[in-house]
């Protein structure tokens, strides 16, 4: 039995609140159970130097956790003068995931930056960030269309992500922190609406996992991501 009483395949209750803040072109609060992430999408004219004159846009992301998002306070990375390796890894993952779903030529020479700020962490912050950021990105693109900044919708398809793992010998989906800290295997999987993979991150924390167990986790993730994309679309309807 999982601590929450959920079945192995069951994800936590997911809530997506759009237009959460006033100023951002796309703003979403996403909640996976007790994990809460604010995803703000900001639109700017112009692109990084390496893209200037190419007629393409750019989508990038930044990720951070508020000092008291966890059980004990963590110092702000700004106070240490640099970002940690985990932060850099996660924000690169978010950026890669979002760029996959955008036609950069249709975006034109505009940059969209997604800021993912973890308000409260209870496992799965990077996957919640990707899932919420995609909805914020869609709202930002719709704003651009309304402003006449793009002629056609640059969105190719939705993207979502989920964590899966092996807990007490059983594959489970959408791990809470207490589960993640005890899991023998932990995976983060990002997929497109069409069912294609963007990223599979898998690590054996305790006991090594078999090929069959890996396939079980991937199949479980596919099912959960289909469910998440349905939730995204309902929020955008």
UniProtKB/Swiss-Prot annotation:
Reaction catalysed by this enzyme: tRNA(n+1) + phosphate = tRNA(n) + a ribonucleoside 5'-diphosphate
One GO molecular-function entry: tRNA nucleotidyltransferase activity
UniProt-listed InterPro entries: ExoRNase_PH_dom1, ExoRNase_PH_dom2, ExoRNase_PH_dom2_sf, PNPase/RNase_PH_dom_sf, Ribosomal_Su5_D2-typ_SF, RNase_PH, RNase_PH_bac-type, RNase_PH_CS
Listed name of the protein: Ribonuclease PH
HAMAP family for this protein: RNase_PH
Keywords: Nucleotidyltransferase, RNA-binding, rRNA processing, Transferase, tRNA processing, tRNA-binding
Pfam families with a match to the protein in the record: RNase_PH, RNase_PH_C
Enzyme Commission code(s) on record: 2.7.7.56
Top-tier EC class: transferase
Presence of keyword tRNA-binding: yes
Tagged with keyword Cytoplasm: no
Position of the signal peptide: none
Species assigned in the record: Idiomarina loihiensis (strain ATCC BAA-735 / DSM 15497 / L2-TR)
UniProt: phosphate binding residues: 86, 124-126
Family: Belongs to the RNase PH family.
An individual GO BP term: tRNA processing
Record note on quaternary structure: Homohexameric ring arranged as a trimer of dimers.
Functional summary from the UniProt entry: Phosphorolytic 3'-5' exoribonuclease that plays an important role in tRNA 3'-end maturation. Removes nucleotide residues following the 3'-CCA terminus of tRNAs; can also add nucleotides to the ends of RNA molecules by using nucleoside diphosphates as substrates, but this may not be physiologically important. Probably plays a role in initiation of 16S rRNA degradation (leading to ribosome degradation) during starvation.
